[in-house]
Amino acid sequence: MITEKEYSAKVGLEHRKKYAQFFTPEFISDFMTDWIFHENPTCCKILEPAFGLGVFSRSILKRKSQICITGYDIDDTVLGVAKANFASKSDIISIAKADYLESKWDAKYDGIICNPPYLKYHDYDNGRYISQINSHLGTNLNGFTNIYTLFLLKSIAQLNEGGRLAYIIPSEFLNSDYGIEVKRFLLQSGTLKHIIIVDFTECAFDDALTTACILFCQKDNSEHDIRFSVIKDVSTLSSALTNYVSYEISELDAEIKWRQ
């Protein structure tokens, strides 16, 4: 099993930046995976839209062995390592060399977990992707939209009833102009449950210092408040589940900054 640390030591930073490969620390992967399975006993079909080396699959398999995982990635280098790492699990883990945003929309999943690529609008062919998302979801995303939010919106649309989603992404969309439409969709879909803002100053994402947020969503059509937590020390990440401020959906305005 080649770990993210070993891979990063062998594969140059230029290559990893080209494919926006900033790997999730395992304790964060475990935390996100716990959300996927919490009160979701029938969860058996899971999607990893940005598979990488499979840190989420490792966390998943620690919790449930009878599972079906579908993964996507476009980088031959990381795919070769990932497929070797999970060669003995090929019956339950399917990893495709394909662009998730080009995959079929009608596939549905009980759990979706992801650390998507972080690419600015000028670093990828955003026009085609944005048109597809707008067409499928009825959104009005603009040309400055970061690719990680496209992953997020498509994934929400692919949840089964009762399905759960955990994403870790930059928090910039909470305050940016392009994020207004993203937040509007999150509110209108009724799936957003919890936003955990985490200061990663002391826990770099593999050479990428960032303030990120973890999003928990569920498709359950229930009336609920939306929780917000801010974590300054990643060692206290689990405290976000009990230490939060909650708002009714009607109290949140997509056009207002959500992070102070």
Language-model features: locations:
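Conserved beta-strand elements of the Class I
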Residues: 45-47
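Short, high-confidence coil segments that cap the C-terminus of an alpha-helix
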Residues: 41-43, 109
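Glycine-rich helix-loop-beta junction characteristic of Rossmann-like nucleotide cofactor-binding loops
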Residues: 35-41
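Signature of N6-adenine DNA methyltransferases within the class I
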Residues: 13, 17-18, 22-33, 50-67, ...
